[in-house]
Amino acid sequence: MALSCGIRTLKNVAVPLKRYPTIAACGLDCGLCPRYYTVGKSRCPGCCGPDFAEKHPTCSFITCCVKRKGLEACGECPEFPCAKFKSTEEYRAAEVSAYPPARKMLPNLHFIKKYGIARFVQQQRQRIRLLESMLGGFDDGRSRSFYCRAAALLGLRGVEGALRKAKR
């Protein structure tokens, strides 16, 4: 049985607590992470995706943001940035992390706060589409992290242009 981080019932229909597992409550860009595209046991299903609770049994961001407040990401919360972000060394380290999804945690949340989750997800889906095109057409089996990094950190126009040139 797949364990997610929670289900709510609406009109007798089970509905996941999160609609978008590709953006984590904490701002991690799950949909652009190499582990999201890994085949096998180490694959991460994204925030609150199937089997998420087995891989990540406790997450204070999910408890506060998703379960208590019913939000997709902390950037939707009127209290963001709360003391949790201001006092978390993890976020200071994330800004200089070599792990691409971590470098975008706070910028993602600030974008969501300013423009909303729908606009963020729209742009993220463009990045995911480009990443999946790179992985499907050019991955030699060892380039997944490189392509994830490009999709996460480079501008959309730059990635689209490079992909067009590569396809010629």
Task: Please place each PLM-identified region on the residue numbering.
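Short loop/turn segments that flank or connect secondary-structure elements
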Residues: L3-I7, G75-K167
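N-terminal cysteine/histidine-rich coordination modules
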Residues: C5-I62, K67-C74
